[in-house]
């Protein structure tokens, strides 16, 4: 019995021990789970997150430190601040309240910085405006960058001597945090431009990869403009003068000539010793070649960079012996200026209608830039605004085209010439060997000659884009009686060239009409046959700023009696764009046009432009032209023209575009003529 009682007691004790052990294990497990939960809670608790250093400093500067629980803690001082409600014209400047302005009067004329919610700063100048301190230069950029509108509430706090923080509150009374990128003009510094020039002593210059990419892009653009084949595009020919020769061409006189697409020429630099010994070398140190066949033989060779010590013999080219080149002893400067034109004659780069052999007896124009021929320029490209688009382009400082040699009467039927290339002013590619004739000759012309075109105000856009005016070549319009025999045969060439110019101008009109669309074609009224015109004269135009040189009409008595009208624009008779409009009621100050006007380079297609209208009395009137999808016409200035010309409702006005380079119209009133 005693043994049986002991056994249950032992089991009971073991059971109690096991229960105590389980309880302890449960307590330990619960403690571990609580620790894990606390750790997770610390990580996910948003109140435990810490702000970055910049945000903390900015918050402390604006709102101050958090108040401590101790009563002895010093209260945080409030920053000086003021607010402004955006009303009225606030975009240009903003007035600072007078009580706050008194504290910063010593900062007048200095710059302060406005800092937004993201820490970006804008520099603004303080200035006095009507005895009131205001934010001036730079405030407009801050308003535009943050898109501040009328009715918004701005709070300015001065956190430093010249730094203000700005809080923007929208109309909804909530703070608006506008994220704006830093302006490019503030973050980027202007890089100094690299000066480029010709290397001295034929030294090689290192070219970066960026320059190579830019040159390739420019080359592709030139190929698209001039329709050149990239495979036929060669490097320009350079004329190098030996450093050991007596005359040394300056860097500014060295010209780069565009070689023909199907030829490449080699430029050879000749040592000074060989140049002095051999009489076949000219004063420039270049070996002369008697015929052009030697140049064609060297077309397979490429441009070679020469060294002074090399003794290889490569074919070279220079100016022909028969060309009119001045000696270096008399006029060295003119000889340097004559070389580029002579190279043009030798390479055959003139117009296709002009023969190369005629270039041998040509005189070269002084002080003329021949890097790119004028008539070969594309007048529709972007950079065409850099040249003058008027007759003044052909009038240089020299006595090449003297204005006193021409007549000054509008109805003159003859052309007065001094034998010094008046044909260059007309852009007619006629060549002549009569260069020594300095006498005044009269050429009778009538207004009934077919193909002849009268000239008073030259329109450069009417010149053919692929024609090179032989500047420096003595082109003259021959006289049947006074001119020599070798000039008489060129009479027919003039008429044929004028017909070609008119045909090209007429074809360009058709291309413009196809671009305008069927809507504009239906509204356009223009004559298909060119008017009969006469070759008159060219006089020096004094063009005022803002007024283009417009063509003038012959309003003589013979015209009023039924005579034919004489157009005075070069090759614009077939290219003139005309349309007729019936005069609206006198109380209508605007005038709607039936078609859109052409778009000038560097101008928007739909915008406002100032045009110049010329009435029958040769008075110029500026009008404001507006082009929108729904309206196309004059919105200002037409009322004055209608009133001064006594136009009545129902009269017909004929508008004619006189120049494509500058928008200028001429108003013709048939009822008044």
Swiss-Prot record:
<feature type="compositionally biased region" description="Basic and acidic residues">
    <location>
        <begin position="328"/>
        <end position="337"/>
    </location>
</feature>
<keyword id="KW-0804">Transcription</keyword>
<feature type="region of interest" description="Disordered">
    <location>
        <begin position="315"/>
        <end position="337"/>
    </location>
</feature>
<dbReference type="Pfam" id="PF02362">
    <property type="entry name" value="B3"/>
</dbReference>
<feature type="DNA-binding region" description="TF-B3 2">
    <location>
        <begin position="576"/>
        <end position="671"/>
    </location>
</feature>
<dbReference type="InterPro" id="IPR015300">
    <property type="entry name" value="DNA-bd_pseudobarrel_sf"/>
</dbReference>
<feature type="DNA-binding region" description="TF-B3 1">
    <location>
        <begin position="79"/>
        <end position="172"/>
    </location>
</feature>
<feature type="compositionally biased region" description="Basic and acidic residues">
    <location>
        <begin position="1"/>
        <end position="34"/>
    </location>
</feature>
<protein>
    <recommendedName>
        <fullName>B3 domain-containing protein Os01g0905400</fullName>
    </recommendedName>
</protein>
<dbReference type="GO" id="GO:0003677">
    <property type="term" value="F:DNA binding"/>
</dbReference>
<dbReference type="InterPro" id="IPR003340">
    <property type="entry name" value="B3_DNA-bd"/>
</dbReference>
<keyword id="KW-0677">Repeat</keyword>
<dbReference type="GO" id="GO:0005634">
    <property type="term" value="C:nucleus"/>
</dbReference>
<feature type="region of interest" description="Disordered">
    <location>
        <begin position="1"/>
        <end position="44"/>
    </location>
</feature>
<keyword id="KW-0238">DNA-binding</keyword>
<keyword id="KW-0805">Transcription regulation</keyword>
<dbReference type="InterPro" id="IPR039218">
    <property type="entry name" value="REM_fam"/>
</dbReference>
<keyword id="KW-0539">Nucleus</keyword>
């Amino acid at each position: 019995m005693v043994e049986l009682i002991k056994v249950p007691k032992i089991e009971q004790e073991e059971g109690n021990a096991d229960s105590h052990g389980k309880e302890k294990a449960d307590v330990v497990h619960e403690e571990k789970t609580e620790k894990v939960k606390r750790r997770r809670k610390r990580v996910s608790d948003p109140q435990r997150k810490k702000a970055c250093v910049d945000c903390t400093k900015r918050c402390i500067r604006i709102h101050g430190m958090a108040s401590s629980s101790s009563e002895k803690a010093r209260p945080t001082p409030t920053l000086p601040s003021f607010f402004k409600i955006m009303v009225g014209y606030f975009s240009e400047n903003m007035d600072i309240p007078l009580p706050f302005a008194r504290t910063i009067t010593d900062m007048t004329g200095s710059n302060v910085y406005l800092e937004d919610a993201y820490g970006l700063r804008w520099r603004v100048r303080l200035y006095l405006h009507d005895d009131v301190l205001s934010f001036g230069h730079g405030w407009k950029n801050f308003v535009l960058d943050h898109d501040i509108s009328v009715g918004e509430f701005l709070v300015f706090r001065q956190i430093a001597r010249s730094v203000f923080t700005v809080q923007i509150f929208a109309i909804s009374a909530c703070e608006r945090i506008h994220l704006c990128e830093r302006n490019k003009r503030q973050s980027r510094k202007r890089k100094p431009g690299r000066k480029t020039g010709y290397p001295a002593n034929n030294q090689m210059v290192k070219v970066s990869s960026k320059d190579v990419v830019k040159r390739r892009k420019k080359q592709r653009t030139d190929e698209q403009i001039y329709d050149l084949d990239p495979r036929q595009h060669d490097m320009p020919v350079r004329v190098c003068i030996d450093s050991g020769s007596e005359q040394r061409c300056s860097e500014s006189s060295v010209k780069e000539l565009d070689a023909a697409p199907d030829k490449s020429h080699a430029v050879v630099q000749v040592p000074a010793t060989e140049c002095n010994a051999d009489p076949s070398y000219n004063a420039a140190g270049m070996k002369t070649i008697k015929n052009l066949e030697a140049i064609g033989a060297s077309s397979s060779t490429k441009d070679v960079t020469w060294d002074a010590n090399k003794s290889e013999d490569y074919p070279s080219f220079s100016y022909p012996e028969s060309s009119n080149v001045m000696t270096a002893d008399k006029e060295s400067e003119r000889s340097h200026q004559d070389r580029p034109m002579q190279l043009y004659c030798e390479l055959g780069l003139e117009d296709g209608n002009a023969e190369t052999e005629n270039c041998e007896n040509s005189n070269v124009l002084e002080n003329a830039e021949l890097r790119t021929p004028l008539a070969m320029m594309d007048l529709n490209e972007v950079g065409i605004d850099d040249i003058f688009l008027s007759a003044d382009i052909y009038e240089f400082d020299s006595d090449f085209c003297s204005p006193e040699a021409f007549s000054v009467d509008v109805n003159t039927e003859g052309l007065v010439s001094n034998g010094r290339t008046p044909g260059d002013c007309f852009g007619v590619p006629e060549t002549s060997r009569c260069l020594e004739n300095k006498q005044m000759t009269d050429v009778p012309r009538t207004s009934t000659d077919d193909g002849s075109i009268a000239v008073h105000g030259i329109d450069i856009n009417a010149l053919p884009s692929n024609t090179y005016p032989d500047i420096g070549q003595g082109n003259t319009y021959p006289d049947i009686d006074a001119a020599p025999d070798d000039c008489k045969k060129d009479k027919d060439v003039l008429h044929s060239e004028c017909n070609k110019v008119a045909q090209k101008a007429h074809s360009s009109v058709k291309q413009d009409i196809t671009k305008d669309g069927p809507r504009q074609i239906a509204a356009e009224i223009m004559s298909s046959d060119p008017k009969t015109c006469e070759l008159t004269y060219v006089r020096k135009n004094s063009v005022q700023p803002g007024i283009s040189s417009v063509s003038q009409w012959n309003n003589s008595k013979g015209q009023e009696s039924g005579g034919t009208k004489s157009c005075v624009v070069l090759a614009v008779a077939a290219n003139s764009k005309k349309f007729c409009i019936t005069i609206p009621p006198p109380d209508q100050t605007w005038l709607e046009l039936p078609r859109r006007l052409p778009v000038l380079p560097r101008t928007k297609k739909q915008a406002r432009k100032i045009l110049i209208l010329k009435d029958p009395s040769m008075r110029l009137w500026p009008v404001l032209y507006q082009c929108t999808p729904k309206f196309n016409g004059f919105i200002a200035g037409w009322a004055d023209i209608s009133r001064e010309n006594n136009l009545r409702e129902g009269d017909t006005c004929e508008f004619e575009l006189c120049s494509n380079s500058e928008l200028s119209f001429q108003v013709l009133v048939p009822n008044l003529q």
